Regions:
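Cleft-lining beta-strand/loop regions that shape enzyme active-site pockets
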Residues: 19-22, 36-49, 193-200, 216-240, ...
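Sec-dependent signal peptide recognition
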Residues: 2-8
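PDZ/PDZ-like domain segments forming the peptide/carboxylate-binding groove
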Residues: 62-63, 84, 103-114, 124-160, ...
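Hydrophobic h-region of N-terminal signal peptides that target proteins for export
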Residues: 10-18
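Acidic/histidine-rich, surface-exposed loop or edge segments in extracytoplasmic proteins
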Residues: 31-43, 81-85, 186-190, 362-368, ...
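Charged, amphipathic alpha-helical regulatory modules used
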Residues: 20-127
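Extended, domain-scale alpha-helical bundle/helix-rich regions
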Residues: 111, 115-240, 249
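Conserved functional hotspot residues or short segments at active or partner-binding sites
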Residues: 119, 136, 170-186, 516-684
Length: 684
């Protein structure tokens, strides 16, 4: 019988829970205003009825216990009393259910984590020789009938985590001491802190978001704090100290320091230092150990020009005996890792060398609350126009525009981006509650880039990405390359306030958008001209997999003409690409990786027997490493990934990008130096 010993630290086995969270007295008014506003502005014009109530109830239960392992069946029976009454309760300004379910969740989670800490403290060794399995996907499993049944689920969960740690240790051939129990107790303590210490505003957000998403998955409630985060992401700016943070043993660990930030200019804070206290606005030093990360970060952020004092445990002295205080003046931080970037790539293929442009766009951003002519206004179309000017100056012969992983953003930006490549005509059609109309490229538009281009997409490219890719494809301006289809989001959201600032805002789906052909991207997405799959290609992560997604539809095509003639080259380009990739050993390995990731994603159950699981994990690890860095040790890999993240560069050995460059080279050769012609007039 094979048994594996685990070192156990002397850690307390009890797990205290927080006091019950209660709503503020005006929160009921927020709930009623949201309910009224959703009925008034949502594109479906659906009343707040029993069906919406049922959906909201399901959303909330799923949010708190997605894998059916915290609540008991008896809890669900009790909660079911509200399944068809949420609509009525909101109309009466009653939001107590949102707090009742949260407080019950905290109670049950405390019991589960208490069981985990006790189990880890008393278990001296684990038996991994028995033919036992662990169900890793429980979203369709019945809720446990009894406490004992729930604890058995958690026993298997912990046994699985211990086994995974042990096998990884063995596969790495590590000589380091393995202390799984201590690590897991710390992790679950942090998880308990994260889930059980939100304030009353966060609980309100969870509840009202469940209500909004009952209409469709992209409608949402935003508390004042969430709206602030949303604006920061769209503006690419925040006011703070300029450090990327993560939780580490209860403290905020500095992972990375933003170039040009107060942290970098001051020079005293270093990567690896841990923040354990924050003093702001002349107040007392507040202990932030084991606080939810969002709360601690909110204390560190603040108005530009104000001072914050941090209590630090230096990386050089992790014992904490040499704590020190560091005062910093907050400043505006540019979130450059979210901005568009471009560079020139020199590519040699078939004895021909060409300079090609590459642009990566992680999101469709624009400054919120500012007009384009105001100082400080920034948008992705402005940044990409600068990139294109630079690429043109360097004499590139074509462009790869990378939209992989781009989840969208501003609706206006894909129209302005299309105008950089297409001279005139409609870009996208919108249908709202009143009418169907088009968003066109303004007349007299000068094209910024006239040379051949390909656009890269994947299954996570969504919304504004799909508008841009779909328009460039439909107008014959670009060749689309990537996964079998994009995400499939074809709806437009509008952000509105709910009254006083403390009431927050809501995001509501007010329109659907359609391609100029009349087809929708809703559910269907954008299909590529050349299918080069990523690891996301076969995963169930598209719009159709999200509860309550709106159905697809179509409308009449807009009045448009082709801006160029890319379509006639697709068949030959596809044939050449298929011939290359079918003979390319590296691409064959990549395709095996795609299939392997699908198998891992669909896996419902895993073995808890050591030998069988080790063989499976070794095979999974080998498959995952197929597309990873080559010829780099671990430290070099980490640094390379950091550099790429800062510059938004694609990963090394990106076989899809490599083949896309070759497709672009083929296209340039076929076009024979031809560029997009200038056309006089408004419509083609």
């Amino acid at each position: 019988m094979r048994k594996i010993g685990i070192l156990v630290a002397a850690i307390g086995v009890g797990m205290a829970t927080s006091a019950a969270v209660e709503p503020r007295n005006y929160y009921g008014k927020i709930g009623k205003r949201l309910a009224d506003s959703l009925q008034k502005y949502h594109v479906l014009q659906q009343p707040m009825d029993d069906e919406i109530s049922r959906r909201a109830w399901t959303n909330l239960v799923t949010f708190y216990d997605f894998d059916h392992s915290v609540f008991l069946k008896s809890d669900l029976d009790r909660l079911a009393a509200h399944e068809l009454t949420i609509d009525n309760e909101l109309g009466e300004e009653n939001i107590s259910f949102g707090y009742d379910i949260y407080n019950l969740y905290v109670q049950r989670l405390g019991e589960r984590i208490g069981f985990v800490t006790n189990l880890l403290a008393v278990t001296k060794s684990w038996d991994f020789s028995t033919n036992e399995t662990y169900r890793i996907r429980r979203k369709d499993a019945p809720w446990p009938e009894t406490k004992a049944e729930a604890e058995d689920c958690w026993r298997k969960r912990i046994k699985n985590e211990v086994l995974v740690a042990r096998i990884n240790h063995d596969l790495d051939k590590s000589t380091n001491r393995l202390d799984v129990a201590t690590d897991l107790i710390k992790r679950y303590r942090q998880y308990m802190t994260f889930m059980t210490e939100p304030d009353e505003e966060a609980v309100l957000q969870h509840y009202l978001s469940a209500v909004a998403r009952a209409y469709d998955p992209h409608s949402d409630y935003m508390s004042p704090a969430s709206k602030e985060d949303f604006d920061m992401e769209m503006n690419l700016t925040l006011c703070g100290i300029g450090a990327t943070l993560t939780m580490d043993d209860g403290a905020l660990k500095i992972v990375e320091i933003v170039p040009g930030s107060p942290c970098e200019r001051d020079g005293r804070l270093q990567e690896g230092d841990r923040i354990v206290g924050v003093q702001q606005d002349g107040g007392p030093m507040e202990n932030v150990m084991w606080q939810p990360m969002k709360k601690s970060i909110k204390k560190i952020r603040g108005k530009k020009g104000t001072k914050v004092i941090l209590q630090i445990i230096p990386k050089a002295d992790p014992t904490g005996t040499a704590k020190k205080l560091i005062d910093l003046v907050r400043d505006e931080i540019k979130l450059e890792e979210l901005a568009a970037t471009g560079h020139v790539e020199t590519v040699t293929f078939d004895d021909t060398t060409r300079k090609l442009g590459y642009i990566y766009l992680p999101g469709f951003y624009e400054s919120m609350g500012k007009r384009p002519n105001e100082e400080g206004f920034r948008s992705c179309s402005m940044d990409i126009a600068k990139c294109l000017a630079d690429l043109n100056a360097q004499g590139v012969e074509g462009l790869v525009f990378d939209l992989r992983g781009d989840g969208g953003g501003s609706l206006r930006e894909p129209v302005l981006l299309s105008a950089l490549f297409v001279q005139s005509g409609p870009v996208v059609q919108l249908r709202d509650l009143r009418m169907v109309g088009s968003l066109p490229i303004p007349p007299g538009n000068p094209i910024a880039f006239r040379k051949p281009m390909v656009v890269l997409v994947d299954h996570t490219s969504a919304s504004a990405s799909e508008i841009l890719a779909g328009h460039l494809q439909d107008s014959g301006r670009a060749i689309i390359i990537g996964d079998a289809r994009t995400h499939g989001k074809g709806t437009v959201q509008t952000v509105m306030g709910l009254g006083p600032e403390k009431y927050g805002s809501f995001k509501v789906t007010t329109a659907r958008f359609y391609r100029i052909t009349g087809l929708t991207t809703q559910i269907a997405g954008v299909s590529p001209d050349i299918h080069l799959p990523s690891v996301f290609d076969q995963l169930d992560i598209g719009e159709e997999s999200i509860p309550y997604a709106l159905p697809s539809s179509r409308i009449q095509a807009a009045d448009y003409r082709l801006s160029w003639d890319m379509h006639k080259y697709v068949k030959e380009l596809r044939s050449l690409s298929e011939k290359r990739t079918s003979a390319d050993e590296k691409f064959k390995k990549h395709l095996a990786n795609v299939k392997g990731m699908k198998a891992i994603h669909d896996r419902e159950e895993v073995s808890l027997e050591y030998a069988a699981r080790k063989a499976q994990m070794a095979a999974d690890r080998e498959m995952r490493e197929l597309d990873d860095e080559e010829d780099e040790d671990d430290e070099e890999k980490t640094e390379a990934k950091k550099r790429r993240r800062k510059r938004n560069e694609p990963k090394k050995n990106d076989v899809v990008l490599e083949e896309s460059y070759k497709v672009l080279m083929d296209l340039i050769r076929m076009k024979g130096g031809e560029e997009v012609p200038e056309v006089k007039g408004w419509w083609y």
